[in-house]
């Protein structure tokens, strides 16, 4: 009997649960370790903020999925992995041994971007603790957004600043501006939303046409884009040129950083802490370990840490875990040359990005809505 430990219920891991449900493996004893029975879907976060979805619409219940797959669900936070000893330790002190390990625990928000420009200075000052909200973990953000919205609507003036110009930062800014202004009405002119990101960091990797569409949408929504970097100071945000940038709340959409316990695991990792895997998503150093989603990296330049690749890699991960347990051949996951990105723009409007092609409109939002709801339904039992 092989012991299979699944860590995290991310997009790729959902495919593993589905595969185990389709073909119960009598020779595998599997357990899923995750902090919560709910897996939140990041693709629907902007729609939740904008008011199009309830929180319950945006999450997957892992309990029936695990039960259907014959997988034990153990609620807990992984905090330590000793890869050479094949041991996983949880926050409450218990440990799990494994023969086969599948990692899809996601990542953390890279708050180092906001840290003061002093060697070794942490983002731990009182102002940041009170005013900076990281996008991850998602469950925390989903819980806090209604409180943030209530504070903004109760104040005579309120400035919400999103730091980060990637797709996540843009979507959050547009969604927040739409929600706050719709709830406040025309009589409340004191709510402002801005985005802090260097010009080159606004939607990096997307075609110029997409960036132009998004720039126009931000302007039409009354969102100020400040093309500078910033760091957290004792009295607020400081721009790269030294000026104070007052904000009542800062949402950090500053990209992802590797989870520290994986960096210390003994697995082969990149310089910035991501687990290195090959095209089969097998660890380059420990063949009994597989990883997918935000926690890993590949040498393939087409591969990026995104939900798109995590979803597409899922079936390959599922096949390879079972194949490795049985001594069978592994499959490769080959990323597509271009990935489709659908960028929500606040109201029921979205921008499509695929290579150099782009489009926008209500029909793109309906397309995105259909894809997102289908993903939730496909993982519901």
Report residues per predicted region.
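Beta1-alpha1 glycine-rich phosphate/pyrophosphate-binding loop at the start
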Residues: 1-72, 170-205
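C-terminal auxiliary extensions adjacent to catalytic cores
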Residues: 341, 347-381
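FAD-site-proximal beta/loop scaffold in flavoenzymes
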Residues: 128-155, 237, 244-312, 319
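FAD-binding core/adjacent interface of flavoenzyme oxidoreductases
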Residues: 70-159, 251
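Rossmann-like dinucleotide-binding core of oxidoreductases
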Residues: 159-205, 213, 224, 308-321, ...
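A Rossmann-like FAD-binding core segment of flavoenzymes
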Residues: 73-76, 80, 96, 180-278
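A conserved FAD-binding loop/helix module that cradles the flavin
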Residues: 295-345
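Glycine-rich, N-terminal phosphate-binding loop of Rossmann-like dinucleotide-binding domains
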Residues: 9, 105-106, 254-255
């Amino acid at each position: 009997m092989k012991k299979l430990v699944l860590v995290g219920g991310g997009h790729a891991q959902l495919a593993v649960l589905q595969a185990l449900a389709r073909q119960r493996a009598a020779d595998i004893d599997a357990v899923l370790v995750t902090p919560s029975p709910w897996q939140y879907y990041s693709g629907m976060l902007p729609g939740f903020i904008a008011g199009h979805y309830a929180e319950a619409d945006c999450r997957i219940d892992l309990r029936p999925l695990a039960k259907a797959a014959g997988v034990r669900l153990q609620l807990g936070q992984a905090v330590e992995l000793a890869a050479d000893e094949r041991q996983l330790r949880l926050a409450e002190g218990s440990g799990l041994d494994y023969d086969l390990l599948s990692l899809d625990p996601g990542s953390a928000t890279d708050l180092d971007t906001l840290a003061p420009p002093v060697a070794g200075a942490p983002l731990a000052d009182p102002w940041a603790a009170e005013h900076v909200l990281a996008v991850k973990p998602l469950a925390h953000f989903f819980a806090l957004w209604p409180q943030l919205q209530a504070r903004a609507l109760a104040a005579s003036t309120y400035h919400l600043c999103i730091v980060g110009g990637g797709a996540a930062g843009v979507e959050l800014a547009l969604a927040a501006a739409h929600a706050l202004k719709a709830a406040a009405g025309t009589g409340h002119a004191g709510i402002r939303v801005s985005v802090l990101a260097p010009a080159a960091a606004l939607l990096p990797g997307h075609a110029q046409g997409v960036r132009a569409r998004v720039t126009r949408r931000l302007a039409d929504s009354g969102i100020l884009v400040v093309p500078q970097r910033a760091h957290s100071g004792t009295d607020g945000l400081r721009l790269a040129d030294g000026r104070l940038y007052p904000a009542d709340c800062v949402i950090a959409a500053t990209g992802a950083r590797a989870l520290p316990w994986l960096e210390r695991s003994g697995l082969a990792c990149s310089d910035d802490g991501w687990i290195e895997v090959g095209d089969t998503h097998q660890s380059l150093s420990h063949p009994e370990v597989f990883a997918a989603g935000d926690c890993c990296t590949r040498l393939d330049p087409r591969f990026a840490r995104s939900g798109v690749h995590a979803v597409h890699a899922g079936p390959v991960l599922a096949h390879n875990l079972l194949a490795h347990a049985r001594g069978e051949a592994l499959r490769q996951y080959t990323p597509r040359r271009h990935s489709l990105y659908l960028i929500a723009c606040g109201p029921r409007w979205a921008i499509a990005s695929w290579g150099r092609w782009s489009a926008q409109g209500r029909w793109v939002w309906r397309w995105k809505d259909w894809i997102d709801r289908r993903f939730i339904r496909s993982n519901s039992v």
